């Protein structure tokens, strides 16, 4: 029994250990179960969060889809609207182009029958004029004949300002092309001697003119500086003089004298142009024109102030101020002289070192300044520019139309009674055409075309066209098939009036810009782009204008 009891005890111990092990295992399992439960709870929470996020994302996606759908719809609408607008714009453009193109068939001019650019040569594009021109091949100058070369004559040299603003000298029979076209002037004489030799100008002894030379634009100048002994004085000082005893004779038909020069000086100083007369024994002061540098204001004084016209124009490139004054003589005045003078500031005195730069002094017989004439020890004369083409193959009968660019170099006082654009030489009155400026007080500076009646030598002028204050313009005229005529200036036309002109049968010349070598009807200005048509042009085709 003891052994059985021992065995039972041993078995009981074994079972106890097994029970203990099982209990431990149960604890471990319980712990694992608890951990698993916690993980499951965490997973469940994560799953719930993920589910919520998924629902939110789905909602957002749905919203975005609706937004995209709306945007797509709007885009479609915008595209449709854009297509509609583009179509409307295209239709409008087509309509505008159609409307704009329609008038041009009346604006574009046909090829002129006579076309002379007068820009840089005497060559004609169309028309007829047998003459000669010079061409340079290597070092050789050759004279070549041609049938489209305008005839040009001038019996003297002449000066001009080329298209680069440089003072230049043209040879005998050489045309002068400036910025505005072909320069056409009548005969003029410069009464200032040694006009292009500054060191020998007849200035007062109180002026120092030793600083002289030629500037970069070719102008011979002197810096006319007051000497120290004049500091504090208020009197004017002569820079160049033509005494009235050696001056211009105004006892005949010519009643105008013009003095001109180019000047520069510090602001406030003044240049005075003075006129005097001489009756054979006594010199008498007539009047002054004062130019104030800086403001370019001109003041006139003296008993003849109301007979003086003066202007000043500054070249912004060269800096030179072109200053001119014209006086009209009255009955009883025989000889008139002129002086170019320095004057101190208005109401002031000469200060140390005051100066005026002076160039191109000129004193001439006429109502406007003309191109500079170089003189030596005596007055010198520039001959008239004579410009012609034949009427043959250029003008025959009506209709006849003309357009030309014109620039006149004169203002309030004309160079003569009827400055010409063109006329005919030596034809019967009924064949004559005169295209010119009017210089009467009522229609001063306006254009007219003059033709004659068949039965008499009475001329009939057109109604005048143009503004008196406009110097540069495109002028023209029409002579229609129905026997009417009119004048045009910068596109503004007069009313038509009757003319008996039917054509020119006489073989003669068209005189352009002047009538005779005496210069009594010369333009004193520029012509460019002269055109003639043997047909009628529309109003739109005649509407050219420049400023």
Predicted regions and their residues:
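Extended alpha-helical stalk/coiled-coil segments
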Residues: 1-109, 113-116, 123
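Extracellular and organelle-lumenal recognition/adhesion modules and their flexible linkers in secreted
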Residues: 95-547
